[in-house]
């Protein structure tokens, strides 16, 4: 349910950018206050990304006020911060549906609005896309302006610098806005972020500035000289020097929460020629004290009461697979001082907070740099250490060449703990972990494990850690099954599955064997009970348990493979390839994710829609058997 807009009288007059631009400039600060309150009250009722949007309210208002969107094109990097943009571009009444099935997309999405120029979700893509648009805008000669907004976390990625370097070389008319809030999802790391965080606060700059003021403050002429010297010194210290060297005209840093100052600055920059760089300083979670104090926790929030000073506690219950991984890391590090855990800026989401505190010398946050994270691990493996890369399935896509070139070709013992494998829920198309089995299965030397529950996950993590070549353990987002986890760890035999249920031998009907890969096992067993089918927990997508497959082929009329991965190229395809290679002709029904980008919705909702719940599995098998 949308909020009562009558409580937000100025925001009510700005449902579109055209309406916003008709407002007097004097009303913009009050509009920002209402927009921030509306955002807080809406997201707290529905859940979603909060702190990022709170931090860019003034910037969003100023950009749409100065630029003639949608003719002028505005690109948001990643998109967590785009809720105010959605509110001001005709989607205010639908904000209560964001991240829900059939609701507003969680990020800017081309199919949703003409104001969303680029569909986003992954970081560091905005400058490259903006550069492409700017090149074409110049060719069209329509005086179209192009703006990209990127955060201080996203700009650390190599792709962003590749785009900056190219833009500085060819000199198109475009604006890059750096939203510097000293915080991405996890705390930013790396030399660049350290420099950004030290703007105007470095000891050299501060001591010279303050010392000079004390000595020379009494002389007006000297004071003016001191001011100029201060500006010159600033140019040597702050990141502007670096961006100027890349070919950009650097302006900043500017207060990102002074909307009228932002409007003035943007108007001044709008018609400047060549690549422009505006550096603004903001506070993530601005205007809501709990989010300002803890922007990591308030990055993505459940439903909560804004009048409380903390988010609701988890109800406990079943552990998440991420927590199982985190516990494994801590337990394994007790006995292996050469274990090295790497994450590309996903410490909290990957369950690594405790490990990072207890074993700081074995923990490495590579920042938003998946390519670097993978090759960093290869270097550690070459040095005789035991690296583990904790990475979301969707982000491993960004390190694919490194997985092949820097790990698999050399057969290095790097284990990939692949979180968010399968459907992730509310984040939708850009974050579904739909492809990792498919793109890893074709890589020589890879071992791919698909645990069905948390205990199997723990044992597979141990198996991968002890393996002498590259391996991957893939597991889904969210709660595990709740079974007892065996603290003792034992390496599994590579490429061996297990038979869990056997069909009764009858002369009636076709005998069905379900080959399960991963956490659909409970659904498979439930469907099998109704169908009297055999169920095998295959465990390994590569190498396959070929002996078990041969046994199932011999004793059954139909095979059914099931996995939470794209059907195309997945584990089921591997089963068929093995059968054809060995002239084992048998009908095979492949169940999994269809050949489409799957939209947002809860995992349960989407499993039902895709007929991957127990009832759906049963029905698909019955339809295939024509029962």
Curated annotation (Swiss-Prot):
PANTHER family: 1-D-DEOXYXYLULOSE 5-PHOSPHATE SYNTHASE-RELATED, 1-DEOXY-D-XYLULOSE-5-PHOSPHATE SYNTHASE, CHLOROPLASTIC. GO terms for biological process: 1-deoxy-D-xylulose 5-phosphate biosynthetic process; isopentenyl diphosphate biosynthetic process, methylerythritol 4-phosphate pathway; terpenoid biosynthetic process; thiamine biosynthetic process. GO terms for molecular function: 1-deoxy-D-xylulose-5-phosphate synthase activity; magnesium ion binding; thiamine pyrophosphate binding. Catalyzes the acyloin condensation reaction between C atoms 2 and 3 of pyruvate and glyceraldehyde 3-phosphate to yield 1-deoxy-D-xylulose-5-phosphate (DXP). Thiamine diphosphate binds at residues 80, 121-123, 153-154, 181, 288, 370. Mg(2+) binds at residues 152, 181. SMART domains: Transket_pyr. Its EC number is 2.2.1.7. SUPFAM superfamilies: Thiamin diphosphate-binding fold (THDP-binding) (SSF52518), TK C-terminal domain-like (SSF52922). It comes from Aliivibrio fischeri (strain MJ11). It catalyses: D-glyceraldehyde 3-phosphate + pyruvate + H(+) = 1-deoxy-D-xylulose 5-phosphate + CO2. Pathway: Metabolic intermediate biosynthesis; 1-deoxy-D-xylulose 5-phosphate biosynthesis; 1-deoxy-D-xylulose 5-phosphate from D-glyceraldehyde 3-phosphate and pyruvate: step 1/1. It is an enzyme of class 2 (transferase). The gene is dxs. This is 1-deoxy-D-xylulose-5-phosphate synthase. GO terms for cellular component: cytosol. Gene3D superfamilies: 3.40.50.920, 3.40.50.970. Its cofactor is Mg(2+); thiamine diphosphate. Binds 1 Mg(2+) ion per subunit. Belongs to the transketolase family. DXPS subfamily.
